[in-house]
Amino acid sequence: MVAFFSPLREPLSLFRISTSPRSFRKVPHLLLLRQTSPCSSQSFSIIFISLSSSNSREGIVFTLSFLIFESNTLLFSSRKSFTLSAFPSGRTVKYTLALLPSLLSSTLVMLTTPKSVGAFSTTKLAIISFICSPSLSFFLLILYLLQHIFVLFKLFAVEYVRYELVYFLFLEYRTRQQSSRVLVVLYLPEHEKFRKSVLNLSVSVTILAVLQGILFYEKVIFTEFYDVEYSPPSSSYEF
């Protein structure tokens, strides 16, 4: 299932989730959203990856991602950050901890949602500290992601059987010409087999690495990607 929405021509008010019944429980679900400012070179992108087969709970996580994406102006208004500029070609990677206000409000939304639509009353929220640079190879990127994810697995080993996990990777990539902000949401389902399967985890992490690499060249790829008309299949859900 691949779902995407382009806010380049109209206000962001709706996004569609299209699924394939045969591959619904096998293929990781992807959501790509991108918002650009016509008056500047700033852009904000969000990647949502879900390995869940639950429509109702997945819809709540999509709603959470949508709220964060729609309120990104407030998200960056009062931030605390530090900059590392030791990378070649004058490139600077800026890592910002600015998710707490949005996470608090979004958590309240999830907790107050009726259980009939899959409220996340037992969801564990975790923020992964992560720094990335285009000079790093995909192999190093995967190692960094695996390191943080496995540390969290050890911390939540007892609770993981009962709780679902939502990981947030927030990256801000700056050059002299442009600024790109990326939020990656990784939703891991409550599944004993998945906890023991390193293969599935490696696949999802590889997807994260590839998508992150694509975002560094978003001017070339995403322009063509969003110019193509999208016709969803017969099986679709709207939030």
Curated annotation (Swiss-Prot):
It comes from the Bacteria. One of its GO terms (cellular component) is plasma membrane. Keywords: Cell membrane, Membrane, Transmembrane, Transmembrane helix. It is found in: Cell membrane. The keyword Cell membrane applies. It is a multi-pass membrane protein. The chain crosses the membrane at residues 125-144, 149-171, 197-216. This is Uncharacterized protein aq_106.
